[in-house]
């Protein structure tokens, strides 16, 4: 457990870093500039981070774990509203970071990693549910659903979270239900031709 002073120092550095990341790319953020913005000395920064990339990596790691916790066991159906809503609430709780993440200088690599959190579990589940559909169809559908969800979330973030979280969750669940109904129809069509 960190002591309170260390926690406050890290929080100041994280908040200042995220603020700077909204304004410029990471390779243009110096440790000196960050420390001045956070009103923290460089020695304190280096006691916790190797460089700004290390700081970003640690922030991403924390958010990634929170998203993983929210995503686990999510089956991407309309009936899975509570889990989808948990993901959306996690994004809302990480509002400042997500603002930077979806901004001009955000980490597209991090977003891609988030999209892959559940790919194997979901496509395995779909293989059992839709045994006559090929892997390309299932993987393409997964990508469509996750990237579509990400687009909805990005629009929500970029519009300053103007809609309630449960509205966004329901929109995503409705999209999933429509896509899964299409997969079900494809499954029945392929099975009927056998």
Give the predicted meaning of each segment.
Residues 92-93, 143-152, 172-177:
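An amphipathic alpha-helical interaction segment
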Residues 2, 8-12, 16, 137:
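N-terminal positioning helix adjacent to the helix-turn-helix/winged-helix DNA-binding module
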Residues 29-30, 99-101, 165:
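Short, hydrophobic secondary-structure boundary micro-motifs
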Residues 155-194:
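C-terminal peripheral helix-coil segments that are non-catalytic and often amphipathic
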Residues 106-131, 136-151, 181:
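Amphipathic alpha-helical packing segments from all-alpha helical-bundle domains
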Residues 10-18, 22, 27-31, 36-39, ...:
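An amphipathic alpha-helix adjacent to DNA-recognition modules
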Residues 71-97:
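Hydrophobic alpha-helical connector segments
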Residues 19-26, 73-75, 94, 125, ...:
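Basic, amphipathic alpha-helical hairpins
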């Amino acid at each position: 457990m960190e002591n309170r002073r260390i926690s406050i120092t890290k929080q100041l550095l994280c908040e200042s870093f995220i603020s700077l990341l909204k304004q410029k790319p990471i390779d243009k953020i110096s440790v000196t500039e960050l420390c001045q913005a956070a009103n923290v000395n460089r020695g304190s920064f280096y006691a916790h981070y190797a460089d700004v990339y290390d700081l970003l990596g640690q922030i991403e790691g924390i958010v990634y774990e929170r998203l993983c916790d929210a995503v686990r066991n999510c089956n991407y159906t309309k009936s899975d509203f509570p889990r989808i809503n948990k993901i959306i609430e996690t994004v809302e709780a990480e509002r400042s970071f997500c603002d930077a993440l979806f901004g001009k200088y955000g980490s597209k690599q991090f977003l891609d990693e988030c999209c892959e959190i559940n790919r194997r579990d979901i496509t395995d589940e779909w293989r059992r549910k839709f045994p006559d559909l090929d892997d390309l169809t299932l993987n393409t559908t997964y990508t469509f659903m996750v990237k579509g969800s990400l687009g909805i979330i990005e629009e929500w973030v970029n519009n300053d979270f103007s809609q309630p979280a449960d509205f966004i969750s329901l929109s995503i669940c409705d999209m999933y239900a429509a896509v899964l109904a299409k997969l079900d129809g494809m499954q029945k069509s392929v099975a009927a031709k056998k």
